Every structure is written in structure tokens, then in C-alpha cells.
Amino acid sequence: MNSKFTAGAVAGIIGGIVFGMMMQMMNAPTPDGGSMPMMGMVAKVVGSSSLAVGWAYHLLNSVVIGVLFALILGGRVGGKGSGAAWGAAWGIVWWIVGGLLIMPLMLGMPAFAPLTMPGMQSVAMGSFMGHLIFGAIMGLSFALLRHAGQEGMQRSRA
């Protein structure tokens, strides 16, 4: 892809779909003692109980995170390995920013609640792994998309 921002957006969607499928399978405890899919918790962030809304919000965030990756770290990605590594690091950053700060605060919980509330530690670790995998897949996808775009540009010049 010619544009690093387009590559970042598409890579974010690819990583976001994988992470979203993981969140769909992971359950989080609810205040009433029940449980719900993590994607349902994502929907609650925007005041909805619809899984479709949760998916839409999650994928929108994935695009934004992918574009920010392209802007901030895209120049450091030299190949598949560095793309996956920088992406994994970016995923950890977003686990802290999104999973431990923004999401709990938007749900009326204290910052870092997934690490400190009883019964939430497994959710925090699942979220950590999900963000790590999201980042690695996003970074790898970014590297592949940028490489393919650069090859295409070189062929069109020849």
C-alpha cells in the first residue's frame, strides 16, 4: 500500500478482527455475579448492550490505533520481525492506556480495576494477551502491506 496511514488502518482492522474474536470468547464478571462476553463490555463503554455496536466501536478503535502506529512507529518497521515486535510493544501500550485506564474509567470503575478487583485478574491477563496478539498481528500486517506497496511502486516505475 502506498500510504502508510492506509496500511496502518488496514493492519489495525486485521489485528482488531483477531482480537475481537478472542474478546467474543472471553467472559468478564458482571456486578450482579454473572458474566458477559468482553465484547459486551466494550459495547457498554458507549452505552449500548448490542454486540454489533461493541464490534463497531472496537474496530473503529483498531483503525485509530493502527493509524497511530503507522504515524509514530511505522518508520521503525523494517521487515516482518520488526513489525511484529514493534506492534507487540504498541499492543502493550494500548493494554495499559485502553484496558487499564480508559475502559475501566468509562465503565465507572477506578483506573487499573482489572488488576485490583477480585475476580478480574484473569480478565486483565486475557486482555493483556489479546492486546499483545493484536499488536503483533497489526505490526506484521503493517510490514507486509507496506512491503507489498513499495514493491508495487517499484514495478510501476520500471
Tell what function each PLM region has.
Residues 1-158:
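Juxtamembrane/disordered regions of integral membrane proteins
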